[in-house]
Amino acid sequence: MNKINEKRKSLINIGSATVYIEIFVLSAILLGASLFFLKDYDAYRAIFLIRIILIAVAALSLIKWAKLKRAEALLSYDSYDGGIGLEVANKLMDRAHIDDGDKVLDVGAGSGLLSIAIAGRFKGSKVVMFDYVNNDDEIIAAREGRLTEEEIRNVSRRSGKFLPLPFENGEFDVVVSGFSLHTDKDNRDKSVLIREALRPLKKGGRFALMDILNEAHGFKDIDNMLYELENNVVSEISTEYMFRDLEEAEEFKKAGIRDARLIYGVK
């Protein structure tokens, strides 16, 4: 997985230089063209040519900017790959109390970091990576690259919508999710997704769900929802903020993650 991120870093570094080179070259062409064509009787040609070149500069710069932003976003998404990601994955696994041989559902697997971490540690377990149908091609490519690179065999893939999940009641021993539910595109109130994520969990099964649990990310009345879950759905539930100290909080904020909370317990 480090190779994947190194490639993205290279794209960002090389791409940034390329943008400046392209702008410089096209600007030089623009200047040269204006000097060559700028004559009274041909002023309209100069203006027309300048407009065409400006449009080309803008279009090429915009395309390159979009590619760079995408690479930066994926790198940030998988900065999860090292410090933050490894710590988050380990904490989720620890709180979920996974046993070797468990059937585990990862809701919103994304690029597969959490699923692959679980499958690598618990080689006797079966891990189902579930994510959006028609998810981003680059995220899918990153996921497949990880599976190949890590030589993971005990993982299967499913896709669909989060509501409802395409699984039977009580199908899994463990349900986990890492920073995924808030990205759901189909439901304004993301709180209902937590309840749905617990539906395929067996009675007595363990869960650990981490997300950005605030109203800005679609989670409404989260405390009331947790109270309702504790009294009607699960037998044990705990919650904790991910920030142990100010330094860690800053690291999460750099990765675009605020109000990160972990919900875990037993159904």
Regions flagged by a language model, labelled:
Residues 117-163:
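Class I SAM-dependent methyltransferase SAM/SAH-binding core
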Residues 101-110:
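Conserved class I S-adenosyl-L-methionine
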Residues 204-211:
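Conserved beta-strand signature within the Rossmann-like core of class I S-adenosyl-L-methionine
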Residues 191-203:
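A short glycine-rich, Lys/Arg-flanked "PGG" loop and its adjoining helix->strand segment in the class I
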Residues 163-175:
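A short acidic, Gly/Pro-enriched loop at the edge of an enzyme's catalytic core
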Residues 245-267:
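Core SAM-dependent methyltransferase catalytic element
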